[in-house]
Every structure is written in structure tokens, then in C-alpha cells.
Regions:
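Conserved hydrophobic beta-strand positions in leucine-rich repeat
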Residues: 68-71, 107-109, 149-154, 178-181, ...
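N-terminal helical submodule of small eukaryotic multi-pass membrane proteins
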Residues: 319, 342, 355-367, 374-375, ...
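Leucine-rich repeat
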Residues: 2, 21-247, 254-256, 450, ...
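C-terminal closing repeat unit and adjoining cap/tail of repeat-based domains
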Residues: 2-20, 419-526
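Amphipathic alpha-helical interface elements that mediate macromolecular binding in regulatory proteins
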Residues: 29, 33-37, 56, 86-93, ...
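Plant-skewed but cross-kingdom recognition/interaction modules and surfaces
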Residues: 196-313, 319, 399-420, 462-479
Length: 526
């Protein structure tokens, strides 16, 4: 009936001059309401308001739309007068009142003004008026009463710090997703929440103040039985984060202020955990994580705080970064088939970082940067982690200088079952006058490296001379099981390297492929 009425209005409005009636094809009017609402969901609130003036039919359609995107800047531009903002909120409140009982599926409220074009003008990128803030909160509560399911509030450009955020919003039974981005508004757990069961599945809080951290996370643990995602980004006043949930699957904590004192997580179904602590954060008094089904872990902080990866039996990938040392990345399966170790340039001690995954067996694929290779050489014979089962190794090296060659030998000696070797040219790059001509093929043969008898594939980037060419010769002449080799050269030395290596007395029947390094990569190098 509603669709027929809309088509009648469209036809009746198309009378030509002189009384002659013409019918106009109105495809939009023929659409079901559900499809029409999907199309309208791409419009801002201002556009919906304009469209509602076309006809009574369009007004009813706009008012019944379940999706709204309110952007204050699109409505009043650079105006910074509180009166203008209050009039705008009057229109919004009127619009919400006219909706009656129509349900809101998603409401996005954006009051994040861009910086003023003229810095010397009186215009500001934020409105510090309390009246405007409380009127906005009043509008938000009206939205909540419309049984909203998804609510996104970007209020960074609104109000002064430490204004209260209405905790009654957390008591909305229909609410499934809530995102709050404020100018350090104060959040508290709802007071009458002892018997309330929230349907929240996704809660994202950014730049907010958690006034009662113990009470707030107790409310999440006890009342949010359906929650799956919890994000806390640049939150304030969280000293104790204690959370217990059987439904939570993703937890993210980024740079809490001030530093955490306790972090206790007990989430049996947690699959993704991301923790980013501030640099040089002090040691926590309590750090306990129970997550038997954890699959992905990201941890960033200082050496004072780190998890024990051995506890996570279902872990598929992990990256642990320390501001003063470097990072360890582990990928795929609980035995970590891919491991990346990147140390900072001047780090000379690998042992603190290795404590993160002490006792684990690193299998399959290993990627090392130059700093890590040098540290392993210093720790030869006393490495706290075994790499005996590594089958694929990639060395990211700036240049194969005389200084790095003994370190490379040390690493290769600890991997007797290596099948794939890739030596890649990566920053930091050394000066051209660096010594690169002290180790010939004879040196490599004297090392009696066990991996050479199992090596099947190798790739090497030759962008400088002698040491790296001699290493390539060693592989070609001694790797009897070699199946394929790829040699990447710059355009300037491709033919010369090819002529030199073609003279090798290869012990295998491997296919050797010579490739020119792409120009885009050469520009990055030189």
C-alpha cells in the first residue's frame, strides 16, 4: 500500500502545462522499502533532511530510514557559533521525534571538526560549550530509545575534557555495537546493572577516561555475556585491567595512560590479543593471561613486561616488539613454521628477547636481519633457542662485507637441515668503500657446513663484488642436491656475473636463472 501511494504521488506531480497529464517513469518509487533504505543509507543527515522536502511520500521514507550518518561539519561548515550548533541540534531532535517508533539500525554521529583554515581567526576546531555537549547527549539518548543496534559517536571536537558520558547508554537492550571517541569524557559502569544482561557484541572506546576501572571491567565480565570484540585505545586512568569472559574473541589495548599496574585476562575463547604499552613502561605487579585458544598475538612494550609464548598452545602467529631491542615474529601453526627476528642496529644482546619464546622449537622458515645475524655469532654455542629444524632461511643483509661473513657462517652451521637459502639485499646499506673481498670459495669449503649437502633451492642478490660472488660459486660447486638457483644482479654487472658463474664446475644438474633487479628497487638502493 505504501509503495502504491509513493508511485501515485510521483505520477500526480508530473502534470504538464495546459492541464495535459504525462506519466513519468520513477524507478526509485517502484523499489521495495528495504532496497530504498539501503540506497538512502549512503546519504548524510543533511541530504536526508533536504530530500524529505520533496514530497510527503519522500518525507515518510526518509523518516523511516534505519541508517543515519550525522556529520556536523557538513551541516554548518566553518561556523563556530554555539547558537548555530544548538539550532542544528533542534532540527536533529525534531527529526528524531517525528520518527515515532521506527527502529534505528545504525546511527553515526560525527562532531569531529577539521582544523580551521585561518589559524589566526577566532574559529576553533572544537566546541567547548557544555550546553552543546549536553544537548548532543540528549539527542544520543533519543537515538537509544529508538532501539538502535549500532551506535558510532565521534565526539572528539565537542566539549571540554572530563565531561560525563551518560552511562545509561550502556543499558540499551537493543545495542549490539558501540564505538565512542571523545575529548577525554568520563565513563562509568552503569549503576543499576546487577541484573541487566547486555547484548553488546562490539565495544570500542577511544580517548576516554575510565573513572572506576575495577567496576567498569567487572561490569563487562558479569553483564556483557555476548561481547566478542573489545577495543581500548588511548584510554586514561586504567591501572587495573581484570577481565573474565567466555565470549570475548578479540581484545585490543593501545597505549593506556598512565601505565598499567595489573593485567589479568581470562578468556577461554580469545583468538586475537593486541597489547601496545607505552615505551619504557615500568614492570607490572601482575601479568596473567589465560587464553588457551589464542591464535594471534601482537605485543609491544618494554622488556620489563612480556608474555610467555609457550603457554599459548593454539598460537598461529605472534609478533613481540620491544622499543630498546627489536622484534620477534612467529607465523603459522603452534610450532611456528615462520619466524622473523629483527634486532636494532646497535643491539649486542639477543638473550633478553629470546626469553619471550624460550624453550620453543623454531621450525620451517626463519628470517633474520643483519643485526640478529651478528648477535647469533657472538652467542655461538650458548644460544637459548634451537634452530636445528629450520629448513628455509632468509638473510636480510645490507652488504656481504668481511665483517658479516663469519656471522653468516655461524648461523648456517646451526641449521644442518636447511633446504632453501635466500640472501636478500636490505637496508641498512654499507658505504661502497666497505671491505668486501676477503673470503673466497676456499674459505667456504673449509667450513664443512652440513647444510650444503641438503640445499635444494637458493636465491642470492649480487649487487656488489667478490664475497657474495664467491658464496654463489661455493653453492654451485658443492650443493649436490641443488634443483634451482636464482641469481639477481643489477643491470651494470649482470653479464659479468653471468660469465663468471657459468665457468663453475657445478656438481648438480640444477637450473640456474639470472634476473635483473627491477628499476624501482634499484632507485631505492642507490
Amino acid at each position: 500500500m505504501e509503495r502504491q501511494k509513493r508511485k501515485f504521488v510521483a505520477a500526480a506531480s508530473c502534470e504538464g502545462e495546459g492541464g495535459r497529464r504525462r506519466r513519468m517513469t520513477d524507478r526509485f518509487s517502484n523499489l521495495p522499502d528495504q532496497i530504498a533504505h539501503v540506497i538512502l543509507s549512503f546519504l548524510t543527515m543533511a541530504d536526508l533532511a533536504r530530500l524529505s522536502y520533496v514530497s510527503k511520500c519522500w518525507r515518510e521514507l526518509c523518516l523511516s530510514s534505519p541508517v543515519f550518518n550525522f556529520n556536523e561539519y557538513n551541516c554548518i561548515g566553518d561556523a563556530d557559533m554555539c547558537d548555530s550548533k544548538l539550532r542544528l541540534l533542534n532540527i536533529l531532535e525534531r527529526f528524531l521525534s517525528l520518527r515515532a517508533d521506527h527502529k534505528i539500525q545504525r546511527f553515526r554521529f560525527d562532531w569531529h571538526l577539521p582544523p580551521p583554515k585561518n589559524q589566526s581567526s577566532s574559529s576553533s576546531s572544537s566546541c567547548g560549550c557544555r550546553d552543546v555537549y549536553y544537548r548532543v547527549m540528549s539527542c544520543v539518548q533519543k537515538v537509544v530509545r529508538c532501539n538502535v543496534e549500532q551506535l558510532e559517536l565521534n565526539l572528539l571536537g565537542l566539549g571540554e575534557p572530563n565531561l560525563k558520558f551518560p552511562s545509561s547508554i550502556f543499558l540499551c537492550e537493543s545495542l549490539k555495537s558501540l564505538s565512542v571517541y571523545t575529548n577525554r569524557a568520563i565513563l562509568r559502569a552503569p549503576s543499576s546493572s546487577s541484573s541487566f544482561s547486555s547484548n553488546l557484541k562490539d565495544l570500542q572506546l577511544l580517548n576516554v577516561v575510565i573513572a572506576d576501572d575495577e567496576g567498569f571491567f567487572k561490569w563487562i565480565s558479569c553483564s556483557c555475556k555476548c561481547i566478542r570484540k573489545l577495543g581500548l585505545d588511548h584510554t586514561y586512568m586504567i591501572k587495573n585491567l581484570n577481565i573474565e569472559s567466555s565470549s570475548l574473541e578479540r581484545l585490543s589495548l593501545s597505549y593506556p595512560q598512565p601505565d598499567l599496574d595489573t593485567l589479568n585476562i581470562s578468556c577461554e575463547n580469545l583468538q586475537l590479543l593486541s597489547i601496545s604499552l607505552c615505551p619504557d613502561s615500568p614492570c607490572m605487579t601482575s601479568l596473567n593471561i589465560f587464553a588457551p585458544n589464542l591464535k594471534k598475538l601482537w605485543w609491544e612494550g618494554s622488556l620489563m613486561n612480556h608474555p610467555n609464548l609457550r603457554k599459548f598452545q593454539s598460537l598461529e602467529s605472534a609478533e613481540v616488539c620491544f622499543d630498546s631491542v627489536g622484534k620477534v615474529s612467529l607465523e603459522k601453526t603452534q610450532k611456528f613454521k615462520s619466524t622473523v627476528i629483527e634486532l636494532k642496529t646497535r643491539v649486542d644482546d639477543f638473550e633478553p628477547l629470546s626469553e619471550v619464546f624460550h624453550g620453543l622449537r623454531i621450525n620451517e622458515v626463519l628470517i633474520l636481519n643483519e643485526a640478529a645475524i651478528k648477535v647469533m655469532f657472538k652467542l655461538e654455542g650458548s644460544m637459548p633457542v634451537s634452530f636445528n629444524n629450520v629448513q628455509s632461511l632468509r638473510m636480510n643483509i645490507g652488504c656481504v662485507t668481511d665483517e658479516i661473513v663469519p656471522s653468516m657462517v655461524s648461523v648456517l652451521r646451526g641449521m644442518p637441515y636447511l633446504r632453501i637459502l635466500y640472501i636478500k639485499r636490505c637496508p641498512p646499506f654499507h658505504e661502497l668503500e666497505s671491505n668486501k673481498c676477503g673470503f673466497d670459495i676456499g674459505y667456504w669449503k673449509l667450513q664443512n657446513l652440513a647444510f650444503i649437502n641438503r640445499l635444494e633451492f637458493f636465491t642470492i642478490e649480487i649487487l656488489e663484488w667478490y664475497n657474495v660472488v664467491e658464496l654463489a660459486r661455493y653453492v654451485l660447486e658443492c650443493a649436490q642436491k641443488l634443483k634451482k638457483g636464482v641469481i639477481i644482479c643489477s643491470a651494470q654487472n649482470l653479464e659479468e656475473v653471468k660469465r663468471k658463474l657459468e665457468k663453475c664446475k657445478m656438481i648438480s644438474t640444477a637450473a640456474i636463472v639470472f634476473k635483473e633487479r627491477p628499476k624501482s628497487e634499484r632507485r631505492l638502493l642507490f
